[in-house]
């Protein structure tokens, strides 16, 4: 009997912000406070911050023009309380000691996964794009079709934690060029043993994660953000970061801990309750870490 490979293991994404109460509690949103959401997306967390206390001011940042358009619509009622900025959070010009709280939600939005032309998911046939900021030039197609076999194997292993990285890279080089997400996913599936091919998750899952990380320089951007963001906090201000896979969480954990400006408040990451996971499956893999700007540390220190 012929088996049909399982589709990618993805939560059924919704527009609900993950860990909503935990974020608001962790940031200690106060009346008249100034907050920075560097991954505004559709505006879910930003709305919660704006509604948590009166006279809150919020700067909403995103590198994706489509996300900013959606956020402007979602947050229109707050008028001049919200300032919108299109920027990658690593490139954002953080003003010194300006915010009571900074939030980053590192998850890929349902919009990106469910919009075929963006090329983030192989559930849909689409061009190999994966650019969060469509103003940039490097796409997933460039990586897959132009990088050599060793480079591909290395990124699949490093950023996708894919143990069959060499085998998959060899097949990709043999079969390329690739033009669509589904073509690539099929080639990956055909390169692995049947037990792996019909496993719990689609064999292309980790490769697609690695490609997305490389195309958007996600981990380097995260490192830069964690280095720069604390300087933008007032003494006693807090930074909250939500990650969704182990590579991100490791960087967040060590980045917050190693910052001379911060005191980590979460010994272990905050995770979703069973009730939240039932209502919002995307929250299943979310991990929230929070740190506070040290009052006695000057902003001139690195």
From Swiss-Prot:
GO molecular function, one term: rRNA (cytosine-N4-)-methyltransferase activity
Keyword Transmembrane helix included in the entry's annotation: no
InterPro entries: RsmH, SAM-dep_MeTrfase_MraW_recog, SAM-dependent_MTases_sf
Enzyme Commission numbers on file: 2.1.1.199
Superkingdom to which the source organism belongs: Bacteria
UniProt-annotated location(s): Cytoplasm
Keywords, sorted A to Z: Cytoplasm, Methyltransferase, rRNA processing, S-adenosyl-L-methionine, Transferase
An annotated GO BP: rRNA base methylation
Role this protein plays: Specifically methylates the N4 position of cytidine in position 1402 (C1402) of 16S rRNA.
Similarity section: Belongs to the methyltransferase superfamily. RsmH family.
Protein name: Ribosomal RNA small subunit methyltransferase H
Source organism of the structure: Nostoc sp. (strain PCC 7120 / SAG 25.82 / UTEX 2576)
């Amino acid at each position: 009997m012929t088996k049909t490979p399982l589709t990618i293991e993805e939560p059924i994404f919704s527009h609900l912000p993950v860990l909503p109460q935990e974020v608001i509690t962790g940031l200690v949103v106060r009346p008249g406070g100034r907050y920075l959401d560097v991954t505004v997306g559709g505006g879910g967390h930003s709305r919660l911050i704006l509604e948590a206390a009166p006279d809150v001011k919020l700067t909403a940042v995103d590198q994706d023009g489509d996300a900013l358009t959606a956020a402007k619509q979602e947050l229109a009622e707050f008028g001049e309380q919200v300032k919108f900025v299109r920027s990658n959070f690593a490139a954002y010009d953080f003003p010194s000691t300006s915010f009571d709280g900074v939030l980053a939600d590192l998850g890929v939005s349902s919009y990106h996964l469910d919009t075929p032309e963006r090329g983030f998911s192989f559930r849909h046939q689409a061009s190999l794009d994966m650019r969060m900021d469509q103003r940039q030039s490097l796409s997933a197609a460039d990586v897959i079709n132009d990088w050599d076999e060793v480079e591909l194997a290395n990124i699949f292993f490093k950023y996708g934690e894919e143990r069959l990285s060499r085998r998959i890279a060899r097949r990709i080089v043999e079969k390329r060029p690739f033009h669509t997400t589904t073509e690539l996913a099929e080639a990956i599936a055909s390169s692995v043993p049947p037990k792996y091919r019909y496993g719990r998750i689609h064999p292309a899952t980790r490769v697609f994660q690695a490609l997305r990380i490389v195309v958007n320089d996600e981990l380097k951007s995260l490192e830069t953000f964690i280095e720069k963001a604390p300087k933008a906090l007032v003494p006693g201000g807090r930074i909250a970061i939500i990650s969704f896979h182990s590579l991100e969480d490791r960087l967040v954990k060590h980045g917050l801990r190693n910052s001379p400006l911060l005191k980590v408040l979460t010994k272990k990451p905050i995770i979703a309750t069973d009730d939240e996971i039932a209502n919002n499956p995307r929250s299943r893999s979310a991990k929230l870490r929070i740190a506070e700007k040290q009052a006695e540390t000057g902003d001139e220190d690195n």
